[in-house]
From Swiss-Prot:
It is found in: Secreted. This is Coagulation factor IX. Ca(2+) binds at E103, N105, E110, E113. It comes from Ovis aries. The record marks R13, A14, R48, V49 as: Cleavage. GO terms for molecular function: calcium ion binding; endopeptidase activity; serine-type endopeptidase activity. The active site is at H89 (charge relay system), D137 (charge relay system), S233 (charge relay system). Its main location: secreted. The gene is F9.
Length: 274
């Protein structure tokens, strides 16, 4: 995810999802977005999971890693065989993106890995990085070839808007990624995950001088020490309901990582139709 420095710079966690996306046909990917609220806030890019645990192989089979030509930089979630959802701020003009599904340990090749090239990136139509890098921070990525689904490569469940909002209010969610394991530290080689509590909106608003729009939510621990961080952007915030995991948020941004009194900021999936 992206972090915001106290010099007024916001860092992304590499980062968020789509507002009012009407995803009725994966081949057409017709998207309907809300209007962007303008902001003069300035941002810089970053993101990851601090204070988390090593995930078991196949524990989060919807998780993917986004690779540029040099290194990995963001996460994402499998929507179906041909589409991945991530944060819009992860998309850079002219940068070739490779999606790696079935990844667990980034330091060695694994038989569960599947690599696909991104042939089309579709940010939410109201997303405008020059106005606000994290408002409506959500995008879809179309893959060149379908993924082969199995126990290590599986789409995340996405409920309708009403139920997604209800699930989010259950209170706790899981975030995952290969981002930094401590603020400004090294990135994880093994997929990390962390259980984070939802933070009430009033507390969320008081915790930062930056604008928290209605399509964002806060999650994390007041005491600090546990958080998503740089490199985690675009990855999932999921809520488990009777043994089934549903996508409820997209890792977007935050102020540094795991700081006391600060929280991770996520795109609220219930604001968008997939």
């Amino acid at each position: 995810r992206a972090s915001v420095l106290h010099t007024s710079k916001k860092l992304t966690r590499a980062e968020t999802i789509f507002s009012n996306m009407n995803y009725e046909n994966s081949s057409e990917a017709e998207i309907i977005w809300d209007n962007v609220t303008q902001s003069n806030q300035s941002f810089d890019d970053f993101n990851r999971v601090v204070g988390g645990e090593d995930a078991a192989r196949g524990q989060f089979p919807w998780q993917v890693l986004l690779h540029g030509e040099i290194a990995a930089f963001c996460g994402g979630s499998i929507v179906n065989e041909k589409w991945v959802v991530t944060a819009a701020h992860c998309i850079k003009p002219g940068v070739k993106i490779t999606v790696v599904a079935g990844e667990h340990n980034t330091e060695k090749p694994e038989p569960t890995e599947q690599k696909r090239n991104v042939i089309r990136a579709i940010p939410y139509h109201g997303y405008n990085a020059s106005i606000n890098k994290y408002s409506h921070d959500i995008a879809l990525l179309e893959l060149d070839e379908p993924l082969e689904l199995n126990s290590y490569v599986t789409p995340i469940c996405i409920a309708d808007r009403e139920y997604t909002n209800i699930f989010l209010k259950f209170g706790y969610g899981y975030v995952s990624g290969w981002g930094r394991v401590f603020n400004r530290g090294r990135s994880a080689s093994i997929l990390q995950y962390l259980k984070v509590p939802l933070v009430d909106r009033a507390t969320c608003l008081r915790s930062t001088k930056f604008t928290i729009y209605n399509h964002m939510f806060c999650a994390g621990y007041h005491e600090g020490g546990k958080d998503s961080c740089q490199g985690d952007s675009g990855g999932p915030h999921v809520t488990e309901v009777e043994g089934t995991s549903f996508l409820t948020g997209i890792i977007s941004w935050g102020e540094e990582c795991a700081m006391k009194g600060k929280y991770g900021i996520y795109t609220k999936v219930s604001r968008y139709e997939v």
